[in-house]
UniProtKB/Swiss-Prot annotation:
This is Mimecan. PROSITE patterns: LRR (PS51450). It comes from the Eukaryota. It comes from Homo sapiens. Induces bone formation in conjunction with TGF-beta-1 or TGF-beta-2. LRR repeats lie at residues 112-131, 132-155, 156-179, 180-199, 200-225, 226-246, 247-277. Glycans are attached at T80, N88, N214, N258. Its main location: secreted. Keywords: Disulfide bond, Extracellular matrix, Glycoprotein, Growth factor, Leucine-rich repeat, Proteoglycan, Repeat, Secreted, Signal. The gene is OGN.
C-alpha cells in the first residue's frame, strides 16, 4: 500500500519539474566571448610590442647592404689608377727658374738647353747660361711667346723652323753667342738683336729681312759682316752695323739709285763706325736719309 502511494505521488510531481536555467552555459558563453577578445587584445599588444622592439633594434643595429652596382662603383674607384703627371704639370722650369705671370726668368742658372716651359709663357729670359743649340721642339707648344732673350749663351746652331710657329713673337735677342748664320725669323718681329756673334754676310739670306714689315730695331754690330744686309724693310728706325768688316756700300744700300725723290724718313740712326769703309767716298748712298750715318768719312 505504501509503495502504491509513493508511485502516485511521483506521477503527480513529475509534470511540475522544469529544467534549471542554463546559467552555467550562459556564463561560459560570456566567459568565452571575453576570453576571445582578451586573447585578441593580448595578441595585438604583443604584436605591437614586438614591432616596436624590432624597430628599435633595427634602428640601433641597421646594416646597409649595398647593391651590386654600388659595390662595382666602389671597386672601380678603388682600383682606378691616377692619371700620370705630364711633364709640364711638374713644372721643372718653375722650380729651377722664376715664373711670374707669363714671364719665365732663367738667368745664370747654368742650363745647357731650353727647359720645358709653361704653355702660357709669353716672355722667356734665359740670359748668361750654357745653351748651345735651339730646336723647333723647344717652342712647339708655346704659341704665345712674345719675347725671347738668349743673350750671353754658347748658341752655335739654330734648327730650321725653330721660330716658325711663333707668330706673335715681337722681340728676339741672340746677342753674345757663337752664331755663324741667321735663322728664318718670325714675321712680326719689331726688334732683332744678334750683336757680338761671328756672323758673316754669307750667313744672311738675301731676303732674310724683306718681309719683316714691323721690324724697327736691328742690331748686328760686332760681327764679321763684309756688307750691309740686302732688302732692309722700310719700317726700320735704328740699324747698328758698327765693328764689322764692311768695306763698301752702294747707292741702293739705303736709298733707290733710280729715284732721286725717294726719302727714307723713318730711319733715325745708322751706325757704321769701326768698319773699313770710308763713308765720304759714297755720298750718293745717303741722299735719301734725314741723318747721315755714324762712321768714318775720311
Amino acid at each position: 500500500m505504501k509503495t502504491l502511494q509513493s508511485t502516485l505521488l511521483l506521477l503527480l510531481l513529475v509534470p511540475l519539474i522544469k529544467p534549471a536555467p542554463p546559467t552555467q552555459q550562459d556564463s561560459r558563453i560570456i566567459y568565452d566571448y571575453g576570453t576571445d577578445n582578451f586573447e585578441e587584445s593580448i595578441f595585438s599588444q604583443d604584436y605591437e610590442d614586438k614591432y616596436l622592439d624590432g624597430k628599435n633594434i633595427k634602428e640601433k643595429e641597421t646594416v646597409i647592404i649595398p647593391n651590386e652596382k654600388s659595390l662595382q662603383l666602389q671597386k672601380d674607384e678603388a682600383i682606378t689608377p691616377l692619371p700620370p703627371k705630364k711633364e709640364n704639370d711638374e713644372m721643372p722650369t718653375c722650380l729651377l727658374c722664376v715664373c711670374l705671370s707669363g714671364s719665365v726668368y732663367c738667368e745664370e742658372v747654368d742650363i745647357d738647353a731650353v727647359p720645358p716651359l709653361p704653355k702660357e709663357s709669353a716672355y722667356l729670359y734665359a740670359r748668361f747660361n750654357k745653351i748651345k743649340k735651339l730646336t723647333a721642339k723647344d717652342f712647339a707648344d708655346i704659341p704665345n711667346l712674345r719675347r725671347l732673350d738668349f743673350t750671353g749663351n754658347l748658341i752655335e746652331d739654330i734648327e730650321d723652323g725653330t721660330f716658325s710657329k711663333l707668330s706673335l713673337l715681337e722681340e728676339l735677342s741672340l746677342a753674345e753667342n757663337q752664331l755663324l748664320k741667321l735663322p728664318v725669323l718670325p714675321p712680326k718681329l719689331t726688334l732683332f738683336n744678334a750683336k757680338y756673334n761671328k756672323i758673316k754676310s754669307r750667313g744672311i739670306k738675301a731676303n732674310a729681312f724683306k718681309k719683316l714689315n714691323n721690324l724697327t730695331f736691328l742690331y748686328l754690330d760686332h760681327n764679321a759682316l763684309e756688307s750691309v744686309p740686302l732688302n732692309l724693310p722700310e719700317s726700320l728706325r735704328v740699324i747698328h752695323l758698327q765693328f764689322n768688316n764692311i768695306a763698301s756700300i752702294t747707292d741702293d744700300t739705303f736709298c733707290k739709285a733710280n729715284d732721286t725723290s725717294y726719302i727714307r724718313d723713318r730711319i733715325e740712326e745708322i751706325r757704321l763706325e769701326g768698319n773699313p769703309i770710308v763713308l765720304g767716298k759714297h755720298p750718293n748712298s745717303f741722299i735719301c736719309l734725314k741723318r747721315l750715318p755714324i762712321g768714318s768719312y775720311f
